[in-house]
Amino acid sequence: MSFGTLYTHNPTPRSTTLIALAKLHNLDVKIIHAEKKNKEAFEELCRYNPLGQVPTFVGADGFVLSECIPLTLYCNDERSSLRILQWMSFANSDLFPAVGGVFLPRIGQRQIIQQDDGDSLRAMLQRCKYLDEHLKRSRYLVGESITIADFFAASLLMGAFAAFRRSMQERFGALCSWYDGVLEIGWFKKVAGGVPDLGLELEIPEDIKW
């Protein structure tokens, strides 16, 4: 029985955990890549989300839900805590734009938010350091047990690790150990695994204070 349809882009880290959860729970979810260039799919998406935002989910019963955080919790059917929401919100609103601001220009793509490269680099380093310090004290983001917050945050860090794996390892050991552990979880690895190593150097100018 169909669970519903997920409109997304290919790729987009904001949908990685959603798709992995659907597979974990054996949910029959139709995946539609609704970029603007796919005119028919994009027009279909806009019938449910006039802004054309992804991810957007349309249930078999017509229930419509968008935004990656509520969608992830909905697919997981997990009783959320405020701390899980805290880390998911941080990853989505702070970490992901910061990583994108550094990663995307270095592979020839447009930044998520237009800002100075130095500001982008400082923001990414500060947020990675924040996570690294937290993970020195805690095995996972929310205590000693893995939660959906870990999978969600790890998926939004893929760009940073794909581009700057060696530099991330040198500077943020606890963060790297956590990230590698999360990506080794079987059901998640089936969807999120195979992150390429682009081997880019993360050069930090002396005037960048973080």
From Swiss-Prot:
Transmembrane segments: none
Known pathway: Secondary metabolite biosynthesis
Domain GST C-terminal: 77-200
Signal sequence segment: none
UniProt superkingdom: Eukaryota
One GO term describing the cellular component: cytoplasm
UniProt keyword Transferase, yes or no: yes
SUPFAM superfamilies noted in UniProt: GST C-terminal domain-like, Thioredoxin-like
UniProt-recorded Gene Ontology molecular function terms: transferase activity
InterPro entries according to UniProt: EF-GSTs, Glutathione-S-Trfase_C-like, Glutathione-S-Trfase_C_sf, Glutathione_S-Trfase_N, GST_C, Thioredoxin-like_sf
Domain GST N-terminal per the UniProt entry, residue ranges: 2-83
Function statement: Glutathione S-transferase; part of the gene cluster that mediates the biosynthesis of monodictyphenone, a prenyl xanthone derivative. The pathway begins with the synthesis of atrochrysone thioester by the polyketide synthase (PKS) mdpG. The atrochrysone carboxyl ACP thioesterase mdpF then breaks the thioester bond and releases the atrochrysone carboxylic acid from mdpG. The atrochrysone carboxylic acid is then converted to atrochrysone which is further transformed into emodin anthrone.
Family the entry assigns: Belongs to the GST superfamily.
Protein name: Glutathione S-transferase mdpJ
Species the sequence originates in: Emericella nidulans (strain FGSC A4 / ATCC 38163 / CBS 112.46 / NRRL 194 / M139) (Aspergillus nidulans)
